[in-house]
Amino acid sequence: MRNLKKMKQFLTLNDLPNFDAQVALAKEIKANPYQFEKVGKRKTLGLLFFNPSLRTRLSTQKAGRLLGMDVMVMNFSNEAWAIEYEDGTIMEGLRSEHVKEAAQVVSQYCDIVGIRAFATLTDKEKDEEEQVLQKFIEHAKVPILNMES
């Protein structure tokens, strides 16, 4: 895409290099949605949902396809093992996948990964840490897109 700096992560609007230019580009894309369909050719967008979603899921899948990307979606509430986020934890019982390995596996199959994970609303300090998002950023080898906060 024209004159856009490559970014490693897109976590907040503050990550955009020039917000006004991005808004103008969004309007241009809205008017001609397929103009960048070759940008994502031979690229895969992985979408990891740790919570239910309607608009975010549909709009992000559509955006990926408009960019020519293959899109893979995984719902962790019912399609995957529960993930452990704490280092040094023994993997047993319900948590049989550590985020470190999960992020590395996802990185092998995807060129960019979108993550949607709600706050738990049980521990304010942990919620502010955004543990799911931050652990994937730490361990993934591909750019991460925050689809929640």
Predicted regions and their residues:
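Positively charged, low-complexity intrinsically disordered leader regions
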Residues: R2-L58, K62
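Catalytic cores of large soluble enzymes that bind and process phosphate-bearing ligands
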Residues: L11-N18, P52, M91-L94, H98, ...
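Active-site cofactor/substrate anionic-group-binding motifs, chiefly glycine-
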Residues: T44, F49-Q108
